[in-house]
């Protein structure tokens, strides 16, 4: 009987995790961004492990990360590892980007406030590729609304961006300044340096193709 109960609990856990991952990621590929699949080349990965291991403190003290650096240095993968690891612990995480959020807001049948409130209900919100969205007045206003609502919810936020810390600390105008100020107040900046993993992956694919064509 105990074995049956344990198996049932295990099944329930797996169903819960599967559901969290289905609802939490905008792209199914993100489910593969795990510590187990890590290539070991990102020196910052121990900071991701630290975040997951100390999740209760991070949540209570509203500590987020601002992951910045050049394209392809592993920022999104790093954030995905945190998301997957917390989902495995049955913590609801939403990992999305502002292009998707702005599309959702335009197409959404529910009100704008309700949509943003729903985003802010997730214990952890991850915004990938911040700064890549269209910089219209409407777009910037919605970006601010989401960041500000998250700030007021006192729940942590993790952001990945190709923008430099200098450009975030010295914005060009007021519209960007109020967004960046909020981000820097909520998130500890972490610089990603090193080789471009995407370029390396592309090179590996090319080498494999050459092998196959021999």
Predicted features, each with a name:
Residues 47-59:
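Pre-Walker A adenine-sensing motif
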Residues 72, 131-132:
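Catalytic acidic motif of RecA-like/P-loop NTPases
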Residues 44-49, 83-124, 134-141:
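Short glycine-rich substrate-engagement loop in P-loop NTPases that contacts/grips substrate
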Residues 59-79:
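Walker A/P-loop nucleotide-binding motif
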Residues 62-66, 93, 124, 156:
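Residue-level preference for the first positions of well-ordered beta-strands
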Residues 1-45, 200-214:
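A short, basic N-terminal segment
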């Amino acid at each position: 009987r105990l074995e049956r109960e344990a198996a049932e609990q295990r099944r329930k856990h797996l169903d819960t995790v599967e559901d969290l991952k289905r609802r939490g990621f905008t792209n199914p590929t993100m489910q593969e961004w795990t510590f187990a699949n890590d290539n070991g080349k990102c020196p910052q990965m121990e900071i991701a492990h630290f975040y997951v291991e100390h999740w209760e403190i991070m949540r209570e003290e509203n500590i987020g990360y601002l992951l910045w650096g050049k394209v392809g240095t592993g920022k999104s993968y790093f954030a995905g590892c945190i998301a997957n690891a917390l989902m495995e612990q049955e913590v609801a995480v939403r990992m999305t980007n502002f292009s998707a959020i702005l599309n959702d807001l335009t197409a959404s049948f529910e009100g704008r406030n309700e949509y943003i409130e729903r985003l802010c209900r997730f214990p952890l919100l991850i915004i990938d590729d911040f700064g890549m969205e269209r910089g219209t007045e409407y777009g910037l206003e919605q970006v601010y609304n989401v960041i500000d609502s998250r700030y007021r919810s006192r729940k942590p936020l993790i952001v990945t961006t190709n923008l430099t810390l200098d450009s975030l600390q010295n914005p060009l105008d007021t519209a960007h300044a109020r967004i960046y100020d909020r981000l820097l107040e909520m998130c500890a900046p972490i610089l990603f340096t090193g080789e471009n993993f995407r370029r390396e992956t592309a090179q590996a694919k090319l080498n494999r193709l050459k092998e196959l064509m021999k």
